[in-house]
Amino acid sequence: MKVISNFQNKKILILGLAKSGEAAAKLLTKLGALVTVNDSKPFDQNPAAQALLEEGIKVICGSHPVELLDENFEYMVKNPGIPYDNPMVKRALAKEIPILTEVELAYFVSEAPIIGITGSNGKTTTTTMIADVLNAGGQSALLSGNIGYPASKVVQKAIAGDTLVMELSSFQLVGVNAFRPHIAVITNLMPTHLDYHGSFEDYVAAKWMIQAQMTESDYLILNANQEISATLAKTTKATVIPFSTQKVVDGAYLKDGILYFKEQAIIAATDLGVPGSHNIENALATIAVAKLSGIADDIIAQCLSHFGGVKHRLQRVGQIKDITFYNDSKSTNILATQKALSGFDNSRLILIAGGLDRGNEFDDLVPDLLGLKQMIILGESAERMKRAANKAEVSYLEARNVAEATELAFKLAQTGDTILLSPANASWDMYPNFEVRGDEFLATFDCLRGDA
C-alpha cells in the first residue's frame, strides 16, 4: 500500500466498529493517526473493541455520546450502516468535520487499480465471478468491500500488480468524494433501502457516486435492459459499456441463446455454471470486465461454465442419485425467487419456500409456480404460500424447518429432479439470518449424501 502523510497526527473518530471500522482503525493507526473508536455495543460484549484497546487504540463503548465531538476531531470515519441523520453524524457535519468512508480511505492508499461493483441485486455473484475470471486468466484479483473483506484491510496487502475487485453498497458509496475505480459495474437499480436513503432518487444518486470521479479513460458497465441506464449514461464522463439480455448492444449481449461481446461469441447460456436469467446478466457484466482486462475468450468461457455460484445465492450444492440440490437461501423476497425459478424446468423441480410473514400475498409468484412438481412449505408465511400454491394448482407438503423440508423433498424426488431452497421470505421467524437457514440445508444435504 501507499504510505501517505494525510492523517499523520490527525485526531480521527471511528464511528461504529464491525469489520470495516476495525480495519479502518488499524489502517489509520498504521498511518500515524490518533484514533478513537466509538461503538454502541458494550465493551464487555465487544471482542473487537477489546482487541483494539490491547493495541493501544482508545475505545469508547456502550453508546454514541454527542459530546465526544467536542474533542476537536479532524476527521470522522463512519460505519456504512449508520445513517446521515444519526445525531453524531449531524453534529459532525454541523461542526464541519470531514466524514470519510472506509472504502475511500482504502482508495487513498491503494497501489492496485480498483474494479467496483454495485447494484440492487447480483453484486456478490458478479463480484465473485469477475475475480474468478481474472484469476483464471493469470491476473491477481483480490475480493474486497461489502463481500466480507473490508477494503481497508485488503488494501494493506495489495500491490501494484494486483486488482481490487470491490463490492460496494449504496451505504458505502453515499459519502465518497475522491473514490475512482478504473472499471465500475452497476448490475441493476431497484427500489431498495429506501428507509435509509429516503427515496429512490436518493438511492440512485448514492449508487451513481461510483462514477463521480471517473474519466473517459475509465469504463462504466451499465444494464441496458433498464431505461434508467440510458438516462444516467448521458451524465457520466466515463466510457460506457452496456450489457443486455434483450437486445444487441455495443458491449455484451445475449442473442439466440449465446452470450457475445461485440459480435464475438463467448459462451452458450446453457453452458453457464449457474442457472437463472439474472445470472445471464451477471455473466454478461463479467464478460465485459474480462474483455476490458484482456482475458482470452476461452478462459472466460471455461471459468463461467465451472462457476458454481456464491454460498446461499443459487449455489449448486451437489447431487445425490442424480438429484441436484440448489441453495438459494439469500432469496428473501418474491423477485429473487422469481429469478431463481427462471433457470429451471418446473416439471422436474421441488421448491422449498416460506419464512417470515410480512403480511404480503404471493400472487405475483403464482405464474412462476405453474407446473412445479411439488412445493414444501414452511414458516410463518405458510398459509399465504399455500394460497399461492393452490392458485398455481401445485401440490404441497408442510415442514417444520429446512432440515425436515429437505428430507421430505428428497423422498419425493426422482432421478433427474432438482431440489431448490428459494424461500421468497426472510428467515427471522425461525433462523437468525439467511446464512444459518442455508447452512441447515447444506448440513442436511451432507447427511443425506452420507446415508445414500
UniProtKB/Swiss-Prot annotation:
ATP binds at G119, S120, N121, G122, K123, T124, T125. It is found in: Cytoplasm. Pathway: Cell wall biogenesis; peptidoglycan biosynthesis. GO terms for molecular function: ATP binding; UDP-N-acetylmuramoylalanine-D-glutamate ligase activity. InterPro entries: Mur-like_cat_sf, Mur_ligase_C, Mur_ligase_C_dom_sf, Mur_ligase_cen, MurD. One of its GO terms (cellular component) is cytoplasm. Belongs to the MurCDEF family. This is UDP-N-acetylmuramoylalanine--D-glutamate ligase.
